């Protein structure tokens, strides 16, 4: 078997979206699974839309997810350069060879003339180009040139049906009448995507083209161009094509670049970790097994085969992404999770960078099994870095838990905690259990509900006794005494 060579070739426009990165992942996983090579090049021939900011964002997205490449931008390789904007001389040379060989011809017809010819022949005027210019006489060409017309350049499409075995979809066929001669270069001689993309694939010896389903209708054109490139000695072989399924959003609509869920960086900023994102992206059209949704990158590489990719559209499910991410958060080693959480909290929240390391390690351990995304840690931990006088109660939680009956456990809890000399979790737990559970006979939910509101402001927090240890004895007692003063809690009008 020929060594596998796949490519990822995005245009540097906008921010990286889920569909784009899923395509990169499947190419990368296939290269790594087969021991092949991934070529990363940039299609930056649209000066009006391309940007260096977008280019940097694409690089950032791949590096964040841990996807590397064997040759391409930022790395180099035997087929440099890897940006299309730097390969224009190459395209012009290939275009000239195609013209000289008669594979490509000048077409002078305007869109209006094509429509008029269709109407005159009783055909649908919107059928598209009618191949009229393919065999113009020298006199006709001279007449058009005399008018000052500048031709576009079209590839001669063989009059045949187009069939191929798609790596994802199996046997695919397009009838010949659906494939008119198509433009490969503008009237100013500038080659189009329809030419430069296959030329790059040919020169870089790409063996497998894995790309989005939206490009499926253009495959006959690429196959025809490959045949022409082989005839002039530019291409050695035609690659195998595999068309990856659409990623759907809400309802039955394709996930749009404008959808917030489409933005990879939105997910990163919300606290999705790379392992969770990679796992979920892989599930958008592929699965490890019917009963295993959670897997790591090594399992993905060991098992990924493009032949197992489904042809049906994949649906993006935010809740499933977060559930998978939660599993990967729990799989992290505690020290690793602590470091990642600290970096995230420092960058994305108001959590102070100078919070004591030993306390943060405990806090991280308390929330690792309680969050789905890193951003949820802020709501659970912000009480630790809020000044006592600035703590605000969640009104709904306070109204439910700070009734007249809460005064007794608050009094008993405060008295018990004041007597604790060594402020540790076991001592705090023992003192409160004796005072509230044993002596007062309260159930834990009743006994500790008011205390939890008192120290955190919320009905849901990390474990109570550990939270009190982190908060410290002084702040714990100050907050509980303020809570007692505000019990029963009355919502301000």
Swiss-Prot record:
GO terms for molecular function: ATP binding; glutamate-tRNA ligase activity; tRNA binding; zinc ion binding. A motif ('KMSKS' region) lies at residues 254-258. InterPro entries: aa-tRNA-synth_I_cd-bd, aa-tRNA-synth_I_codon-bd_sub2, aa_tRNA-synth_I_cd-bd_sf, Glu-tRNA-ligase_bac/mito, Glu-tRNA-synth_I_codon-bd_sub1, Glu/Gln-tRNA-synth, Glu/Gln-tRNA-synth_Ib_cat-dom, Glu_tRNA_lig_a-bdl. It catalyses: tRNA(Glu) + L-glutamate + ATP = L-glutamyl-tRNA(Glu) + AMP + diphosphate. Keywords: Aminoacyl-tRNA synthetase, ATP-binding, Cytoplasm, Ligase, Nucleotide-binding, Protein biosynthesis. It is found in: Cytoplasm. Transmembrane segments: none annotated. One of its GO terms (biological process) is glutamyl-tRNA aminoacylation. GO terms for cellular component: cytosol. ATP binds at residue 257. Its EC number is 6.1.1.17. A motif ('HIGH' region) lies at residues 10-20. NCBIfam families: gltX_bact. Belongs to the class-I aminoacyl-tRNA synthetase family. Glutamate--tRNA ligase type 1 subfamily. Catalyzes the attachment of glutamate to tRNA(Glu) in a two-step reaction: glutamate is first activated by ATP to form Glu-AMP and then transferred to the acceptor end of tRNA(Glu). PANTHER family: GLUTAMATE--TRNA LIGASE (PTHR43311), GLUTAMATE--TRNA LIGASE, MITOCHONDRIAL-RELATED (PTHR43311:SF2). Monomer. This is Glutamate--tRNA ligase.
